[in-house]
Structure formats: structure tokens, C-alpha cells
């Protein structure tokens, strides 16, 4: 893979409010043991009523700046991965541009659901490698609690809120990106959706309360079948073996799903980083949260080779192999 960009900084933010399994017991017919057994989740963070995806995104970028120690005025592209933008338009990316007063930049949102962060990294790397841009800010931000049906016990136990940001800069000598693999199965879109204008999909009537609707069984089957094949293809493209990978960071959809993917891909679970236990499923945000949690715990070292894999609604997926080096 011809890459000329490097990951140079990371920042994250989660809301203060915690929604525990015990809290959910008071809202729906469920219990802590049932949730942990099926998902591995104990807590998730929930945005306040007047806190939106743009607010979380801005705080994640501010957190990035505490370690980056430089200003962002020369950022020439802002990419925001989100399914829960404050508005249909303007984009969250434009709100970030306004807040940080970045003078000359392209700014747009992309919607690839839980694969949004890896999509954003891939697009950002491609823009820099092409020579059209030099510094790209990639942000993932979600307030899924605002579109979660808290009467549906199969979905409301899953989702949480948060934001993560990564900075990409042109560096031909120490590029981060090694390989990518991606794919889409639009036929499976009916299994995970949230309505907007249309009330049907491929002539099938939809639930139209604008909340997340998921056929968990079908999504599980697709992910545990598709992602292991994608990992194999990704390693083949990079001319690597799993032994060459220091850390596997999948989308933190559900711990049981991750365990199945690891088993089928022969990935030791101790080489896997997630944010699922105390953050829940934060869609596009789960991978940067897992990365930053590991960084803060001292697990990530400069020179580590990481395999990131996002997958979700669409149905769509994208995996990346990158070298981690913030030096």
C-alpha cells in the first residue's frame, strides 16, 4: 500500500453520565447477569439532554490538543464519522471548523455506521497520499442514546455515546498505513437501520419511529462470517501473518461477537483491545476509544503493528493494518 501519511495524535471524550446494567434493570425486563452473559457489557456513557454529537466531538479534539501541543490552523480537511449528527445539515465537521476557527479546510461528514472510523482513516490517508492534502483531522462522534428505543430490551442494552479524534499528517519517511480491505453488502441493510424520509426499503415496510432497529441474529451471523474472511484477506494483502500483529482492535459491537471473530481468525483474546465493557457499543467511536484506553494504560508502544476492523450497518466493513508511532 502506497501511503504517505502518519497518525500523529489522538484524543477522546465520553459523557459523565453512566448507565449501568443495574440502571437498565429498573427500566426494562432485564438483569445484569443476562446482559453480561450475552454482551460482556457492564456500563455505557450517555449524553445529557442538551449534549449533542458536535459537543462530544469538540471535546475529543480539545483532548487531542492537550498532547499534540500545536494549533490546528493548518488542518486542510476535517472528516467526521457519525450517524447521529446534530442536524441533517450543516455537518458536524463544519461545526468543528467554526469552533476551532480553522481558516482554509474542506469539511464533511461520512456515514458508514460502525465502520465510520476506519472509513475516515482510509479516506484521510488517501487524500494525503494523493498529494491534495497535508493534515487531516478524523473524528468519530455518536450520541446513540438519542436514537435508542429504551422499550426494546434487545437493543437498548447495547448503545453508548462518545467521541474520538485522530490527526493524520503527511510523512513520506514514517507512514502509518500498511494495508486495507473493505466490502459492502447492501442487501443486508434491512437488518440494521434507522429511518429518515423513506418508510420502505426494497419494498419492505420499515419501523418509522426514527430509532435504531436491529435484527441482532442476522447482524451477528454476517459479522462473524464476513470479518474473519476480511482479516485473512487483509493479512494476505500486507504479506503478513497474525503473529506479525501486536494488537487486534475490532469494532466493540458485543464481546461475544468479538470472541467468535477471534476464534475463527485464530487471534488470541489477550491480543485484542476493546472498549465494550464500560463504554458499550459506541458505533464509529469504539475503535478510537479502545486505542486511547490502551494508550493511557501503557499497552500501546511506538512501533506496534495494529489491525483495526470496523463493521456495521449498511452492511459495510473496512479493515486497516497500521503502525502505531506518536513519537
UniProtKB/Swiss-Prot annotation:
Species of the source: Bacillus anthracis
Reaction(s) the record says it catalyses: malonyl-[ACP] + acetyl-CoA + H(+) = 3-oxobutanoyl-[ACP] + CO2 + CoA
Protein name (database record): Beta-ketoacyl-[acyl-carrier-protein] synthase III 2
Active site: 114, 251, 281
UniProt GO BP: fatty acid biosynthetic process; secondary metabolite biosynthetic process
Pathway membership, UniProt: Lipid metabolism; fatty acid biosynthesis
Domain notes: The last Arg residue of the ACP-binding site is essential for the weak association between ACP/AcpP and FabH.
Subunit composition and interactions: Homodimer.
Amino acid at each position: 500500500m502506497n501511503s504517505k501519511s502518519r497518525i500523529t495524535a489522538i484524543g477522546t471524550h465520553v459523557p459523565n453520565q453512566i448507565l449501568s446494567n443495574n440502571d437498565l434493570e429498573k427500566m426494562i425486563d432485564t438483569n445484569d447477569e443476562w446482559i453480561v452473559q450475552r454482551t460482556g457489557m457492564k456500563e455505557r456513557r450517555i449524553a445529557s439532554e442538551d449534549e449533542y454529537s458536535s459537543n462530544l466531538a469538540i471535546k475529543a479534539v480539545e483532548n487531542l490538543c492537550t498532547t499534540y501541543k500545536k494549533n490546528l490552523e493548518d488542518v486542510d480537511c476535517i472528516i467526521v464519522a457519525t450517524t447521529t449528527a446534530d442536524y441533517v445539515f450543516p455537518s458536524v465537521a463544519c461545526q468543528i471548523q467554526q469552533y476551532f476557527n480553522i481558516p482554509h479546510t474542506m469539511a464533511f461528514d461520512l456515514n458508514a455506521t460502525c465502520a465510520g472510523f476506519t472509513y475516515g482513516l482510509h479516506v484521510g490517508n488517501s487524500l494525503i497520499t494523493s498529494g491534495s492534502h497535508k493534515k487531516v483531522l478524523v473524528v468519530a462522534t455518536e450520541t446513540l442514546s438519542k436514537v435508542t428505543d429504551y422499550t426494546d430490551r434487545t437493543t437498548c442494552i447495547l448503545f453508548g455515546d462518545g467521541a474520538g479524534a485522530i490527526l493524520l499528517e503527511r510523512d513520506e519517511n514514517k507512514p502509518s498505513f500498511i494495508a486495507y480491505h473493505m466490502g459492502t453488502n447492501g442487501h443486508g441493510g434491512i437488518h440494521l437501520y434507522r429511518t429518515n424520509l423513506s418508510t420502505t426499503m426494497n419494498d419492505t415496510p420499515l419501523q418509522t419511529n426514527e430509532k435504531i432497529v436491529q435484527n441482532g441474529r442476522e447482524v451477528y451471523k454476517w459479522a462473524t462470517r464476513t470479518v474473519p474472511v476480511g482479516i485473512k484477506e487483509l493479512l494476505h494483502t500486507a504479506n503478513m501473518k497474525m503473529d506479525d500483529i501486536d494488537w487486534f482492535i475490532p469494532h466493540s459491537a458485543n464481546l461475544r461477537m468479538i470472541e467468535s471473530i477471534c476464534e475463527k481468525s485464530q487471534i488470541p483474546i489477550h491480543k485484542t483491545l476493546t472498549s465494550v465493557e464500560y463504554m458499550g457499543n459506541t458505533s464509529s467511536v469504539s475503535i478510537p476509544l479502545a486505542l486511547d484506553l490502551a494508550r493511557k494504560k501503557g499497552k500501546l508502544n511506538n512501533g506496534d503493528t495494529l489491525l483495526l476492523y470496523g463493521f456495521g450497518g449498511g452492511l459495510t466493513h473496512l479493515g486497516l493494518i497500521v503502525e502505531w508511532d506518536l513519537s
